[in-house]
């Protein structure tokens, strides 16, 4: 069997990726989230496939088909809630994975990092089009508001908007194409994940110390397969607690009302994992400015490798930048909270301050902290 796994063209590929892969001996549990994201992706594709068998993308029947899945299909309620809450778990793992990358300086693996940003954007797009599919109140109005942002693009905005809608509002054509996008995007994500891993295995994993670990590598199996398995069990436990005890805690009550184009919900807001970006979008009074800030809030991640001038890898031995990092995380949580609040004082002001702070920490404060820390190093 050993010879088989090392010689067979297909098994050799799997062997070099998951079995005989040389991994640093000191990577912590923060490195578990990559494999957890893989598990989340598999759960989403499998549950999504079964949901697609019973879902209809017509505006007149979409809401009823989701109700039919929950009421009449064997374990349909379970599949539906696994899919909905699985998306939340996906984004929790994604945020931690990116946060770990920033903390430990993994962004210096340029290709892996950039593919990761593309993956992040693709996952956000998938989640957005998926949220529209039940054709309920918040789905409909969320789709209307977010797609409407395209009209802020000069000259071609309105034409582009009507082209994406397939009409003059979110209607049957929109729902059908969003279903098509939602079906194909996870497979594109899977392909991108393979490219992500390909680039990662070219350089090898980063590790908490930030030092070169080539002199101290251990095989991925059995050490990290067992470690990842523990993470997977914990993830599934949290997911099942969510699904079986609090299935609607992360959803919106408005989504249990069929879409009504004549009645606008009091507070239109996206799913919780988009709230930080939504808060940044809302904090700028100008429409085009808001859209640019929204896009930049994610694309700013691509600037990390170029803004980093530190002589040390990662933030483990850099207290000033470490302090800024945790302020940044706290600020992100504040933005998430603000995104779910109505547009009124004091929420708007807090949102504007947090949005400014979000970009200032990354573009100004962290590079300055890098320089200060480099000077402190030079003094010793």
UniProtKB/Swiss-Prot annotation:
<feature type="transmembrane region" description="Helical">
    <location>
        <begin position="288"/>
        <end position="308"/>
    </location>
</feature>
<feature type="transmembrane region" description="Helical">
    <location>
        <begin position="77"/>
        <end position="98"/>
    </location>
</feature>
<dbReference type="Pfam" id="PF00032">
    <property type="entry name" value="Cytochrom_B_C"/>
</dbReference>
<keyword id="KW-0408">Iron</keyword>
<feature type="binding site" description="axial binding residue">
    <location>
        <position position="196"/>
    </location>
    <ligand>
        <name>heme b b566</name>
    </ligand>
</feature>
<dbReference type="Pfam" id="PF00033">
    <property type="entry name" value="Cytochrome_B"/>
</dbReference>
<keyword id="KW-0472">Membrane</keyword>
<comment type="function">
    <text>Component of the ubiquinol-cytochrome c reductase complex (complex III or cytochrome b-c1 complex) that is part of the mitochondrial respiratory chain. The b-c1 complex mediates electron transfer from ubiquinol to cytochrome c. Contributes to the generation of a proton gradient across the mitochondrial membrane that is then used for ATP synthesis.</text>
</comment>
<feature type="transmembrane region" description="Helical">
    <location>
        <begin position="347"/>
        <end position="367"/>
    </location>
</feature>
<dbReference type="InterPro" id="IPR005797">
    <property type="entry name" value="Cyt_b/b6_N"/>
</dbReference>
<dbReference type="GO" id="GO:0006122">
    <property type="term" value="P:mitochondrial electron transport, ubiquinol to cytochrome c"/>
</dbReference>
<feature type="binding site" description="axial binding residue">
    <location>
        <position position="97"/>
    </location>
    <ligand>
        <name>heme b b566</name>
    </ligand>
</feature>
<dbReference type="InterPro" id="IPR048259">
    <property type="entry name" value="Cytochrome_b_N_euk/bac"/>
</dbReference>
<feature type="transmembrane region" description="Helical">
    <location>
        <begin position="226"/>
        <end position="246"/>
    </location>
</feature>
<dbReference type="GO" id="GO:0045275">
    <property type="term" value="C:respiratory chain complex III"/>
</dbReference>
<keyword id="KW-0830">Ubiquinone</keyword>
<keyword id="KW-0999">Mitochondrion inner membrane</keyword>
<dbReference type="GO" id="GO:0046872">
    <property type="term" value="F:metal ion binding"/>
</dbReference>
<dbReference type="InterPro" id="IPR036150">
    <property type="entry name" value="Cyt_b/b6_C_sf"/>
</dbReference>
<keyword id="KW-0813">Transport</keyword>
<feature type="transmembrane region" description="Helical">
    <location>
        <begin position="33"/>
        <end position="53"/>
    </location>
</feature>
<comment type="similarity">
    <text>Belongs to the cytochrome b family.</text>
</comment>
<keyword id="KW-0249">Electron transport</keyword>
<feature type="binding site">
    <location>
        <position position="201"/>
    </location>
    <ligand>
        <name>a ubiquinone</name>
    </ligand>
</feature>
<dbReference type="InterPro" id="IPR005798">
    <property type="entry name" value="Cyt_b/b6_C"/>
</dbReference>
<dbReference type="InterPro" id="IPR016174">
    <property type="entry name" value="Di-haem_cyt_TM"/>
</dbReference>
<feature type="transmembrane region" description="Helical">
    <location>
        <begin position="178"/>
        <end position="198"/>
    </location>
</feature>
<feature type="transmembrane region" description="Helical">
    <location>
        <begin position="113"/>
        <end position="133"/>
    </location>
</feature>
<feature type="binding site" description="axial binding residue">
    <location>
        <position position="182"/>
    </location>
    <ligand>
        <name>heme b b562</name>
    </ligand>
</feature>
<keyword id="KW-0349">Heme</keyword>
<keyword id="KW-0479">Metal-binding</keyword>
<protein>
    <recommendedName>
        <fullName>Cytochrome b</fullName>
    </recommendedName>
</protein>
<comment type="subunit">
    <text>The cytochrome bc1 complex contains 11 subunits: 3 respiratory subunits (MT-CYB, CYC1 and UQCRFS1), 2 core proteins (UQCRC1 and UQCRC2) and 6 low-molecular weight proteins (UQCRH/QCR6, UQCRB/QCR7, UQCRQ/QCR8, UQCR10/QCR9, UQCR11/QCR10 and a cleavage product of UQCRFS1). This cytochrome bc1 complex then forms a dimer.</text>
</comment>
<keyword id="KW-0496">Mitochondrion</keyword>
<feature type="transmembrane region" description="Helical">
    <location>
        <begin position="320"/>
        <end position="340"/>
    </location>
</feature>
<dbReference type="InterPro" id="IPR030689">
    <property type="entry name" value="Cytochrome_b"/>
</dbReference>
<dbReference type="GO" id="GO:0008121">
    <property type="term" value="F:ubiquinol-cytochrome-c reductase activity"/>
</dbReference>
<feature type="binding site" description="axial binding residue">
    <location>
        <position position="83"/>
    </location>
    <ligand>
        <name>heme b b562</name>
    </ligand>
</feature>
<dbReference type="InterPro" id="IPR027387">
    <property type="entry name" value="Cytb/b6-like_sf"/>
</dbReference>
<keyword id="KW-0679">Respiratory chain</keyword>
<dbReference type="GO" id="GO:0005743">
    <property type="term" value="C:mitochondrial inner membrane"/>
</dbReference>
<keyword id="KW-1133">Transmembrane helix</keyword>
């Amino acid at each position: 069997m050993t010879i088989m796994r090392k010689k067979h063209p297909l098994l050799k590929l799997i062997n070099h990726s998951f079995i005989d892969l040389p991994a640093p001996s000191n990577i912590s549990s923060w490195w578990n989230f990559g494999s957890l994201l893989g598990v989340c992706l598999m759960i989403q594709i499998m549950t999504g496939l079964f949901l697609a068998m019973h879902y209809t993308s017509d505006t007149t029947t979409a809401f009823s088909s989701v109700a039919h899945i929950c009421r009449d299909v064997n374990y349909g309620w379970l599949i539906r809630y696994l899919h909905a809450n699985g998306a939340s778990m996906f984004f929790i793992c994604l945020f931690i994975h990116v946060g770990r990358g920033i903390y430990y300086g993994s962004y210096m693996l340029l290709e892996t990092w950039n593919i990761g940003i593309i993956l992040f954007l693709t996952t956000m797009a998938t989640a957005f089009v998926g949220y529209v599919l039940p054709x309920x109140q918040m789905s409909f109005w969320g789709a209307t508001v977010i797609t409407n942002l395209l009209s802020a693009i000069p000259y071609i905005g309105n034409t582009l908007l009507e082209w994406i809608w397939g009409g003059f509002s979110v209607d049957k054509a929109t729902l059908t194409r969003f279903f098509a996008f939602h079906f194909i995007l996870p497979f594109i994500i899977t392909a991108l994940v393979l490219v992500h891993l390909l680039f990662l295995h070219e350089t090898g994993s980063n590790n908490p110390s930030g030092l070169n670990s080539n002199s101290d590598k251990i095989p991925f199996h059995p050490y990290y397969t067992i470690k990842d398995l523990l993470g997977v069990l914990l993830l599934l436990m949290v997911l099942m607690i969510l699904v079986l005890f609090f299935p609607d805690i992360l959803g919106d009550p408005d989504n249990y009302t069929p879409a009504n184009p004549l009645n606008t919900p009091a507070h239109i807001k996206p799913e919780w994992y988009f709230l930080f970006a939504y808060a940044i979008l809302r904090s700028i009074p100008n429409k085009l400015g808001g859209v640019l800030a929204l896009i930049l809030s994610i694309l700013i991640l691509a600037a990390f490798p170029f803004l980093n001038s530190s002589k040390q890898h990662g933030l483990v031995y850099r207290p000033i930048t470490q302090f800024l990092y945790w302020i940044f995380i706290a600020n992100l949580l504040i933005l998430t909270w603000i995104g779910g609040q109505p547009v009124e004082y004091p929420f708007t002001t807090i949102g504007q301050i947090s949005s400014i702070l979000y970009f200032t920490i990354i573009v100004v404060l962290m590079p300055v902290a890098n320089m200060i820390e480099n000077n402190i190093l030079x003094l010793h």
